[in-house]
């Protein structure tokens, strides 16, 4: 086992504080409408430029191991805030820095660290309740645009694009961000259910000019099995041919004579048919086939349910207004499934999302939810260079997370004003002893830090502006972009309540642990013995000098 380096008390805390400040100072320059960029060196390719707090935090590793421990703990604050709300990482880092700095001063002055932490926790619990009282719902397109604009660093086009996307696919719809090919941002909306499986044979194509298969008012056969024997399919093919409607077959696989028969029938015009593989794998495939059958009003032909393909009838098939199949995707538009059945399926998926523990499972469940409830919107980010593209894409993703958080828990006045108002309303709070009271004051003072930093980044005097804002009431605050005072809601400067709440809670949680730290342990650096071993043979040969 490697030897350890152990530091105690003030010596440990000073080292840790140095690490906290290095990371927080690098992150906080990005805050506000006049925040600066940070350039991050990469091991290969061009450096990346960002105004995203968590991207800056993730890049920082310090040489001194004790300082690095402090930096890594604050990095955890930014990561947690990012995971919870997708934004507010810079605010969370700044709050943590302020609480740690003020808290460690109090510890050095002889206060009890545990009581300080209890005071900080008490102040935060009270502040979160006050935040909920200040929060107003964010439901209209204008408010969503404003939240998106603020989070995208005052880029109004991004805010408007996100609001348009949410309007088209609904608040539950999936909105993805991709790198575009042009200079302008674009919005592409896919209505209906789309999955990543294309036609099994190019001979199904009936629109050669675009290379796609288009079926109008088709029957849809959903089978959770491989189909290779054509005899299984003959009864259903005959029934569909008599109806005069086209047929889409979605199955685990379709091969051999079964596929050949379908191709021949399609080319001769006996029955207009197309076949695709079922999306997903394993249990996820079964769930998605069930989704498709519910959306189209059909049944999944599955041997597990004792259903045989040979005995299936037109009543077992689903229907849709239109199906479009390309080389890579299948889109089902206007499924005729019953609304209450679709709605109960949506409720079931929502319940699964709440119970899911892994991010991957949640992401896949959200995709299924969107496909059933509205559609998918793709935001394509345009830029002149790759460096700008990466920076812009990160901002758009932040803005998207912020707008989702705003719809979920509402909004409060932005620009650090909400936290100042909350601190004012919590100022009469008292703990069980003086040390707890100091902890409460530490937390309340920290709540002014975001406003002070926004003002500092815009080149004004933080204390003057903070006092002016404190003298005001309600949503009265300072607009750093235009250098004027007024109602932040009227200015369109809003923060999602969830983002502000998460930032405060995670900052206080980690900062409280750091204040109560008394000992730090790390590995001692290993001594490089190679230089000693290289020098020993030469030293042993010294006596040979007399032979010359």
Curated annotation (Swiss-Prot):
GO terms for cellular component: cytoplasm. Keywords: ATP-binding, Chaperone, Cytoplasm, Isomerase, Nucleotide-binding. SUPFAM superfamilies: GroEL apical domain-like, GroEL equatorial domain-like, GroEL-intermediate domain like. Residues 539-548 have a biased composition (Gly residues). Gene3D superfamilies: GroEL, GroEL-like equatorial domain, TCP-1-like chaperonin intermediate domain. GO terms for molecular function: ATP binding; ATP-dependent protein folding chaperone; isomerase activity; unfolded protein binding. The keyword Nucleotide-binding applies. It catalyses: ATP + H2O + a folded polypeptide = ADP + phosphate + an unfolded polypeptide. It is found in: Cytoplasm. GO terms for biological process: protein refolding. Its EC number is 5.6.1.7. Belongs to the chaperonin (HSP60) family. Forms a cylinder of 14 subunits composed of two heptameric rings stacked back-to-back. Interacts with the co-chaperonin GroES. This is Chaperonin GroEL. It comes from Buchnera aphidicola subsp. Myzus persicae (Myzus persicae primary endosymbiont). The gene is groEL.
